[in-house]
């Protein structure tokens, strides 16, 4: 796919993105700074945050860190997770994000999730206004289904806008995006930047040895990943990683990035120690044979037509 995302000085967005959801929360200032520097040194140029992350601390800390490198980095944030995708909420969120990060322009602004109660024409008319004023450069959508994304793309076009980014959940154990979102994004020339390529940490192998994290601390993540077939896949991934002389997190991120539509997985962590295996995926060469072996650990979802015999 043609490079869709560049920084203000034209630097291409990196193969992986770094998500700062933990900044100012489970990662304090020092840990956040260390992870930012590690990501930067590994070649990451695409950083992702959101208006709602850690009550604004994520954006504030990221803004402080990017200042010396601003023009060569892509900074993406999200609006309207709460409060709806109304013009007033989008404008207020964008302005708050700019203020927190001390940025004149937000490289990318996502609608954080689909709002069934707001006419998307009003939402994208607001995006057009923000782009015209130089507040944003790119437009993204997050947690949209394929039909919602296609509808959004059509409405955006009415305002001479293009949706550049879509952010779905995607990992070895959460593969629904393969059915319609990934092919739709490729067809519409939208860059797919999936989140949770490690399955909430399940694919790191830490829970098998009694480790703690979001799956043990957050009921939402427990409900999302607490299935036997997922635990079995994670265990098998760890065995394959041992055989390959790598870390399961490296293989999991590299597998997600190796999909034929060339997505840009968003990696994240609480510390540099956690982050290092994911960063190693930047240079990992995923062979077709290994990709297929890992894909076979979890059944592929049926096609949208549900005619599995034709898959």
Protein language model regions, located:
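N-terminal binding-site loop/beta-alpha segment at the start of enzyme catalytic domains
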Residues: 1-73
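A structural motif
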Residues: 13, 44, 103-106, 136, ...
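Hydrophobic faces of well-ordered beta-strands that scaffold small-molecule active sites
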Residues: 14-19, 47-49, 75-77, 109-111, ...
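Active-site mouth loops of central-metabolism enzymes
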Residues: 19-30, 79-88, 112-118
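Short, acidic/polar
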Residues: 27-39, 86-101, 124-125, 149-153
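Structural motif
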Residues: 38, 42, 100-101, 134, ...
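CE4/NodB-like, metal-dependent polysaccharide N-deacetylase domain
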Residues: 90-110, 132-133, 157
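Beta/alpha (TIM)-barrel catalytic core signal, keyed to glycine-rich beta->alpha loops juxtaposed to Asp/Glu
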Residues: 118-301
């Amino acid at each position: 796919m043609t490079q869709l995302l560049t920084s203000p000085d034209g630097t291409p967005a990196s193969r992986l993105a770094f998500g700062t959801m933990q900044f100012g929360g489970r990662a304090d200032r020092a840990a956040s700074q260390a992870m930012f520097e590690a990501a930067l040194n590994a070649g990451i140029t695409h950083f992702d945050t959101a208006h709602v992350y850690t009550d604004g601390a994520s954006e504030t800390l990221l803004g402080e860190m990017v200042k010396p490198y601003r023009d060569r980095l892509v900074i993406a944030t999200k609006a309207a997770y709460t409060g709806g995708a109304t013009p007033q909420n989008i404008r207020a969120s964008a302005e708050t994000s700019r203020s927190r990060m001390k940025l004149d322009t937000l490289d990318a602004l996502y609608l954080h999730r689909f709002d069934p109660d707001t006419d998307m024409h009003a939402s994208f008319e607001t995006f057009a206004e923000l782009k015209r004023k130089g507040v944003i450069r790119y437009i993204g959508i997050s947690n949209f289904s394929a039909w919602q994304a296609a509808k959004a793309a059509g409405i955006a076009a009415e305002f001479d806008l293009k949706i550049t980014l879509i952010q779905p959940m995607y990992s070895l154990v959460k593969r629904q995006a393969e059915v319609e979102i990934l092919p739709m994004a490729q067809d519409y020339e939208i860059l797919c930047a999936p989140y949770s390529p490690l399955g909430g940490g399940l694919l790191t192998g830490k829970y098998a040895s009694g480790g703690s994290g979001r799956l043990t601390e957050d009921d939402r993540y427990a409900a999302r990943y607490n299935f036997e077939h997922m635990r079995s896949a994670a265990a098998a991934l760890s065995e394959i990683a041992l055989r390959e002389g790598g870390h399961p997190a490296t293989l999991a991120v590299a597998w997600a990035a190796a999909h034929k539509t060339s997505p840009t997985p968003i990696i994240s962590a609480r510390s540099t120690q956690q982050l290092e295996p994911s960063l190693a995926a930047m240079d990992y060469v995923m062979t077709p044979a290994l990709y297929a072996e890992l894909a076979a650990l979890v059944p592929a979802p049926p096609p949208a037509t549900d005619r599995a015999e034709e898959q």
